[in-house]
Curated annotation (Swiss-Prot):
One of its GO terms (biological process) is silent mating-type cassette heterochromatin formation. Keywords: Chaperone, Chromatin regulator, Coiled coil, Nucleus, Transcription, Transcription regulation. Residues 219-263 have a biased composition (Acidic residues). Histone chaperone that facilitates histone deposition and histone exchange and removal during nucleosome assembly and disassembly. One of its GO terms (cellular component) is chromatin. Residues 181-249 form a coiled coil. InterPro entries: ASF1-like, ASF1-like_sf, Hist_deposition_Asf1. This is Histone chaperone asf1. Its main location: nucleus. Residues 267-282 have a biased composition (Polar residues). Gene3D superfamilies: Histone chaperone ASF1-like. Signal peptide: none annotated. Residues 193-218 have a biased composition (Basic and acidic residues).
Length: 282
């Protein structure tokens, strides 16, 4: 909680000529006795494009500060024209009223200021060189922008927390190492799944090759057997050769067809037994 609270700011002379001093009636409340003075400052923003042209118009030390509500008049000089770009004199700019304690700013009030000529004729057709005596400033007092900052006052107890509270258990763990371990574990699990899938695929291919070899072996044996029978039959009788050859030829054709069916069934069975698993990557 802030020891000093700004209650109100009243601009005494507004609108006013450009070269007239600024006058503020400031009201604030102090909740406890302070050891040091309050420092008030007024800054004129000379250009919206660079802080190089900012001017501190005046500063004022107020103290000792009694506990309770306090009021005082803060007066500051007009800005130095030599430090303002000619093109930035007319138009809208900003003034900043700030207060600090022991070098630490705790409140800032910003006002828009419109600088314009006091006649419609000059406003419509401004001269190349500004006529300062004809320029008037108008502070938009109804729309200030107030920013407050938590600071350390006289006691360490009221100092704001600069760092998050200690968390001994959390501090003992290395977040970077833990994150790296999780990544390594996930990568290892993924590699294991891929290797297992490859082994399953290779194993399925072996089954298919074995089935094909067995079928081919059976076909060879049947063909050899058919050839042997044909040779024996040729030795026994020439008259029966044609008929037996036709019969054996028909049997061989049937055996080949059966062999094709068997091979197809074996291949289909092997393909049905082996199905590649879908790998879900998380």
């Amino acid at each position: 909680m802030s020891v000093v609270s700004l209650l109100g700011v009243k601009i005494v002379n507004n609108p006013a000529p450009f070269l007239a001093p600024y006058q503020f009636e400031i009201t604030f409340e102090c909740l406890e006795q302070l050891q040091k003075d309050l420092e008030w400052k007024l800054t004129y923003v000379g250009s919206a494009t660079s802080s190089e042209y900012d001017q501190e118009l005046d500063s004022l030390l107020v103290g000792p500060i009694p506990v309770g509500v306090n009021k005082f008049l803060f007066e500051a000089d007009a800005p130095d024209l030599k430090r303002i770009p000619t093109s930035e004199i007319l138009g809208v700019t900003v003034i900043l009223l700030t207060c600090s304690y022991d070098g630490r700013e705790f409140v800032r009030v910003g006002y828009y200021v419109n600088n314009e000529y006091d006649s419609e004729e000059l406003t419509q057709d401004p001269p190349a060189k500004p006529i300062i005596e004809r320029i008037r400033r108008n502070i938009l007092a109804e729309k200030p922008r107030v920013t407050r900052f938590a600071i350390k006052w006289d006691s360490e107890e009221d100092a704001p927390a600069e760092y998050p509270p200690d968390q001994p258990e959390a501090d003992l763990e290395d977040d970077g190492a833990a994150y790296g371990a999780e990544e390594a574990e996930l990568e290892a699990a993924l590699i294991r799944e891929l290797e297992e899938a490859e082994r399953e695929a290779a194993k399925g291919g072996d089954h298919e090759m074995e089935g094909a070899e067995e079928t081919a072996g059976k076909d060879d044996e049947e063909e050899d057997l058919s050839d042997a029978e044909s040779e024996d039959i040729e030795d026994e009788s020439d008259d029966e050769e044609d008929d037996l050859d036709e019969d054996e030829g028909g049997d061989r054709d049937e055996d080949v067809e059966m062999g094709d069916d068997t091979e197809s069934k074996d291949t289909n069975a092997a393909s049905g037994h082996h199905q590649q698993q879908d790998i879900m990557v998380h």
